[in-house]
Amino acid sequence: MSSKVTRKIYFCGSIRGGREDAALYKRIIDQLQSYGEVLTEHVGDLEAQEEELGETCDDYYIHERDINWLFSSDAVVAEVTQPSLGVGYELGRALEHKKNVLCLYRPQPGKRLSAMIKGAENGKNFFVKEYKEEDVPDLLMNFFTSL
């Protein structure tokens, strides 16, 4: 009898930087669940309590918990439209540990994606894709089938 190993996916999205896109995060996370276990599904939980989002936890605890999840993941998917220092930090650590990363960015008038994210794209394990929400299924399929 063989056991199936489930892919672990770390999803990044703004929490303290703004929750305007939480509903979108939830829809992306719902799609990601068909590719594996999403370790950070609380990021898209519209009804998450402060404790679940880490608002009432010690900052050290949140950092250690999330970094452990990040390092144990097989792939990282980040929605980077809403600027977030935390997401940028997570992506830097993911790149440092040679994780497979897909960044999703919705172009908006008068706003540009940080060069530190866009410039990290290497065509090997770090990808940045401009998208509309209807593009997400194909972008995820292409990313995960290439791993």
UniProtKB/Swiss-Prot annotation:
Q: Which GO terms describe its cellular component?
A: cytoplasm; nucleus
In terms of InterPro entries, this protein maps to: 2'-dNMP_N-hydrolase, DNPH1, Nucleoside_deoxyribTrfase
Catalytic activity of the protein: a pyrimidine 2'-deoxyribonucleoside 5'-phosphate + H2O = a pyrimidine nucleobase + 2-deoxy-D-ribose 5-phosphate; a purine 2'-deoxyribonucleoside 5'-phosphate + H2O = a purine nucleobase + 2-deoxy-D-ribose 5-phosphate
What keywords are assigned to this protein? Answer: Cytoplasm, Glycosidase, Hydrolase, Nucleotide metabolism, Nucleus
Coiled coil residues, start to end: none
Q: What domain of life does the UniProt record list for this protein's source?
A: Eukaryota
**EC class name:** hydrolase
Residue numbers binding substrate: 10-16, 25, 42, 90, 114-116
Give its E.C. classification number: 3.2.2.-
**Summary of the function given for this chain in its UniProt record:** Catalyzes the cleavage of the N-glycosidic bond of deoxyribonucleoside 5'-monophosphates to yield deoxyribose 5-phosphate and a purine or pyrimidine base.
Q: Which family does it belong to?
A: Belongs to the 2'-deoxynucleoside 5'-phosphate N-hydrolase 1 family.
Q: How does it assemble?
A: Monomer and homodimer.
Name of protein: Putative 2'-deoxynucleoside 5'-phosphate N-hydrolase 1
